[in-house]
From Swiss-Prot:
ATP-binding keyword on record: yes
Gene Ontology biological process: ADP biosynthetic process; AMP metabolic process; ATP metabolic process; cellular response to hypoxia; GTP metabolic process; regulation of oxidative phosphorylation; ribonucleoside diphosphate biosynthetic process
Subcellular location: Mitochondrion matrix
Pfam family, one: ADK_lid
NCBIfam families referenced in this protein's UniProt entry, alphabetically: adk
Species in which this protein is naturally found: Pongo abelii (Sumatran orangutan)
Keywords: Acetylation, ATP-binding, GTP-binding, Kinase, Mitochondrion, Nucleotide-binding, Transferase
Lineage: Eukaryota, Metazoa, Chordata, Craniata, Vertebrata
Disulfide-linked positions: none
Free-text domain note: Consists of three domains, a large central CORE domain and two small peripheral domains, NMPbind and LID, which undergo movements during catalysis. The LID domain closes over the site of phosphoryl transfer upon GTP/ATP binding. Assembling and dissambling the active center during each catalytic cycle provides an effective means to prevent GTP/ATP hydrolysis.
Protein name, as recorded: Adenylate kinase 4, mitochondrial
Length: 223
């Protein structure tokens, strides 16, 4: 199997299970899971220049613009030139995808297609610990104590945009922005779309796909 570094991207709407799939890919194949949300939180906490720029938009519940998120992610990717990685939350727009093109070639793109009703149900059951970004789902990943973060003991909250009335708008926005990104990667022959309502049913196919590109470090049973 080739020793070429693997550059992968995962796409999917809020509630599609991207975080869970990324975690399994990282565990099974040794890829670095690079989450734009995680890097944003780190930079905001550290009061970096790019963190301060992003904070202005996040506090107003606005999407962080391309030039800010691209600057942040380019810096992170520059530090990981010698690693296999999986991008989560970037690129979200065609502009971001074009910026990524300038520094590397993406080998593999996964797009998760989850029915709207499933997304609505999942998001309405989702609670988060804002300081860390830890996400819980009351159905399949509940906290040990209801409403409390497992690690810190701090209270969990439900985001306003996870409430059912906001989910439809978020999904429409995702589809509008993601469509040209999906079409771009589809035209290059690197896009693989997975549809379903359960991560556990999608996972074996994702595992097989990655196994054809990179040697697993542990068996697929290791969830």
């Amino acid at each position: 199997m080739a020793s070429k570094l693997l550059r992968a991207v995962i796409l999917g709407p809020p509630g599609s299970g991207k975080g869970t799939v990324c975690q399994r890919i990282a565990q099974n194949f040794g890829l670095q899971h690079l989450s734009s949300g995680h890097f944003l939180r780190e930079n905001i906490k550290a009061n970096t220049e790019v963190g301060e720029m992003a904070k202005q938009y996040i506090e107003k519940s606005l999407l962080v613009p391309d030039h800010v998120i691209t600057r942040l992610m380019m810096s992170e990717l520059e530090n990981r030139r010698g690693q296999h990685w999986l991008l989560d939350g970037f690129p979200r727009t065609l502009g971001q995808a074009e910026a990524l093109d300038k520094i590397c070639e993406v080998d593999l793109v996964i797009s998760l297609n989850i029915p709207f009703e499933t997304l609505k149900d999942r998001l309405s059951r989702r609670w988060i610990h804002p300081p860390s970004g830890r996400v819980y789902n009351l159905d399949f990943n509940p906290p040990h104590v209801h409403g409390i973060d497992d690690v810190t003991g701090e209270p969990l909250v439900q985001q306003e945009d996870d409430k059912p009335e906001a989910v439809a708008a978020r999904l429409r926005q995702y589809k509008d922005v993601a469509k040209p990104v999906i079409e771009l990667y589809k035209s290059r022959g690197v896009l693989h779309q997975f549809s379903g309502t359960e991560t556990n049913k999608i996972w074996p196919y994702v595992y097989t796909l990655f196994s054809n590109k990179i040697t697993p470090i542990q068996s697929k049973e290791a969830y």
